[in-house]
C-alpha cells in the first residue's frame, strides 16, 4: 500500500473542506452562487412506522431571495418564495389550489431558513445556535425551549462543491427525523423567473 505522508493529508483536507472551514469562507462561497437547481429525495422516519415515508422533488434557488421547493411525488405540491412573498399550492386531480391553511406560517419559517442557507448565512438565525464541525458539518440547535419541543436539532452536510449542501437531517427527537439528500445539482445555470410564480 502506498504511504501517504502528513503533508499530503493536509493538502487533501484543504482541497475537500477549504471552502467550509469557517463561517467567512462559507459566506464567501455563497456570494459566487447566482442559482442552484437540484433534485431531492426526502425520507421521514417515524417511530410508529416500519418504513419511512418517501417523497421526491426539485429545489430551484435564484439569489438572493427566490426559492421553489416542489414535491413531485407522491403528493404534488409547490412552495414558492419570491422577494419575500411565500405561497403554497397543492394539486388535486388536474387542478392546482392555493393553500392558505394554518400550516402556512410554519412552512414560511422553513422557506426563510432554507433561503438563509442558500445565501451561506447558517449562523444568522437568532432562534438557533450554529456550530461548524470538521468536514463541512453544521449543527443547528434551538435556543428557546418552545422551539426545542418541535425540533431537537438540524444537521447539514456541505458538499465538496463550494456553496452546495449535500444533505439535511431534521431531528424532532431521538427517534423521529426527516432526511433530505440532494443530487443532480446544477450551479449558476440560467433560470426562468416565471418558475417562482405559480400559474394555476
What are these regions (language model features)?
Residues 11-22:
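Bacterial Sec-dependent signal peptides at the C-terminal "C-region" and cleavage site
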Residues 54-56, 74-75, 82, 149-153, ...:
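Short, surface-exposed coil-to-beta transition loops
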Amino acid at each position: 500500500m502506498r504511504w501517504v505522508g502528513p503533508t499530503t493529508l493536509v493538502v487533501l483536507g484543504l482541497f475537500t473542506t477549504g471552502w467550509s472551514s469557517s463561517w467567512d469562507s462559507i459566506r464567501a462561497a455563497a456570494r459566487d452562487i447566482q442559482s442552484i437547481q437540484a433534485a431531492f429525495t426526502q425520507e421521514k422516519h417515524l417511530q410508529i412506522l416500519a418504513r419511512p415515508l418517501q417523497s421526491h422533488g426539485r429545489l430551484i434557488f435564484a439569489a438572493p431571495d427566490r426559492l421553489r421547493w416542489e414535491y413531485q411525488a407522491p403528493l404534488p405540491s409547490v412552495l414558492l418564495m419570491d422577494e419575500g412573498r411565500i405561497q403554497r399550492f397543492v394539486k388535486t386531480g388536474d387542478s392546482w389550489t392555493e393553500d392558505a391553511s394554518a400550516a402556512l406560517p410554519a412552512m414560511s419559517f422553513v422557506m426563510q431558513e432554507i433561503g438563509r442557507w442558500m445565501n451561506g448565512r447558517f449562523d444568522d438565525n437568532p432562534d438557533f445556535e450554529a456550530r461548524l464541525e470538521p468536514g463541512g458539518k453544521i449543527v443547528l440547535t434551538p435556543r428557546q425551549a418552545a422551539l426545542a419541543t418541535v425540533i431537537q436539532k438540524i444537521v447539514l452536510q456541505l458538499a465538496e462543491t463550494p456553496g452546495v449542501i449535500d444533505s439535511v437531517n431534521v431531528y424532532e427527537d431521538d427517534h423521529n427525523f426527516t432526511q433530505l439528500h440532494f443530487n443532480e445539482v446544477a450551479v449558476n445555470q440560467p433560470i426562468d423567473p416565471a418558475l417562482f410564480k405559480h400559474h394555476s
